[in-house]
């Protein structure tokens, strides 16, 4: 469905090199990315600002021409076959609109039907399904400029799907949305993914979107893929530092040390302690605490995905710094 082989994109910029002199510098926005995404997959594509996410999406949709490497989407080459590709993909950018600002949603959808030459029966069936899942009926006849951000985003999703795309690219689809609107969008995308009819590629900084929707996670940093696998594999590789939180009847003895763990917090005059588990299992840590003090309550806190991804970014940049020094 989507194939990338050693895909790269560089940009030439001019940087100040003196009072009156500027020199050219080549920046690799995407650097040798190779990925294969199958039909019906829901893939999260994440990274810090400037990592190359949006540049990759623009190459996949035919907006940018790769500097080197190969890319195909739905068996088509995005740039030379951009018109044909547009009929087979849908794109939603959280900060850009494909709707007509002064027209009601219903009229925007009719125009898109004409643009994509969708048969009337297919158009109505898809629109009805989107209306049911996204609750559009209450604002179909309101001009887009008068819609709330959440309503407009639901309209954007519908507009991207009315021509029956095989691949849906989503760039920050929940940015700026309130809790209720986010939940509506996530529920809709989850239902869409369960059917397996559409391949979904999602880029976002809201990692809750990724955790709830995507089965596969690709992390990119400095233009290179640093992780490609399941969220569980990411946790296993970078999320081993669980925390043990214990409520005690009395403080731990002075100088207490838990081998393989670091005390990272103490509250309530020592009656609540937090340990970060490094090279000790939760079971062994619990046994040591129970031996040392009267324990009233215990909980093991798994690192959430934001902590795990932050650690991945930090480790990657530390490694890059060491490489540069060497």
What is each of the regions a protein language model found here?
Residues 69-77, 85-86:
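Conserved ABC transporter NBD signature motif
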Residues 168-172:
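Catalytic Walker B motif of ABC-type/P-loop ATPase nucleotide-binding domains
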């Amino acid at each position: 469905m989507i194939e990338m082989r050693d895909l790269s994109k560089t940009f030439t910029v001019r940087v100040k090199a003196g009072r009156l002199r500027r020199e050219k510098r080549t920046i690799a926005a995407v650097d040798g990315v190779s990925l294969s995404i199958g039909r019906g997959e829901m893939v999260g594509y994440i990274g810090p600002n400037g990592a190359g996410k949006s540049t990759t999406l623009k190459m996949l949709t035919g907006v940018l021409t790769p500097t080197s490497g190969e890319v195909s989407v739905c068996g088509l080459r995005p740039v030379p076959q951009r018109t044909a590709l547009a009929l087979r993909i849908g794109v939603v950018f959280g900060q850009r609109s494909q709707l007509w600002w002064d027209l009601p949603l219903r009229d925007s959808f009719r125009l898109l039907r004409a643009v994509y030459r969708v048969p009337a029966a297919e158009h109505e069936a898809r629109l009805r399904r989107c209306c049911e899942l996204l609750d559009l009926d209450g604002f179909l006849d309101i001009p887009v400029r008068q819609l709330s951000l959440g309503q407009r985003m639901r309209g954007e999703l519908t507009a991207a799907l009315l021509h029956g795309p095989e691949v849906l690219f989503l760039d920050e689809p929940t940015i700026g949305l309130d809790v209720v609107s986010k939940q509506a969008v996530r529920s809709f995308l989850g239902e869409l993914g369960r059917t397996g009819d559409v391949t979904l590629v999602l880029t976002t900084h809201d990692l809750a979107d990724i955790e709830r929707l995507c089965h596969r996670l690709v992390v990119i940093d400095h233009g290179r893929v640093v992780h490609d696998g399941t969220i569980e594999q990411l946790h296993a590789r970078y999320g081993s530092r669980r925390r043990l939180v214990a409520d005690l009847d009395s403080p731990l003895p002075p100088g207490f040390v838990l081998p393989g763990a670091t005390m990272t917090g103490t509250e309530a005059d020592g009656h609540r302690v937090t340990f970060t588990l490094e090279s000790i299992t939760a079971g062994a840590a619990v046994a040591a605490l129970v031996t040392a003090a009267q324990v009233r309550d215990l909980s093991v806190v798994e690192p959430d995905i934001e902590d795990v991804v932050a650690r991945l970014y930090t480790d990657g940049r530390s490694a890059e710094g060491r490489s540069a020094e060497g």
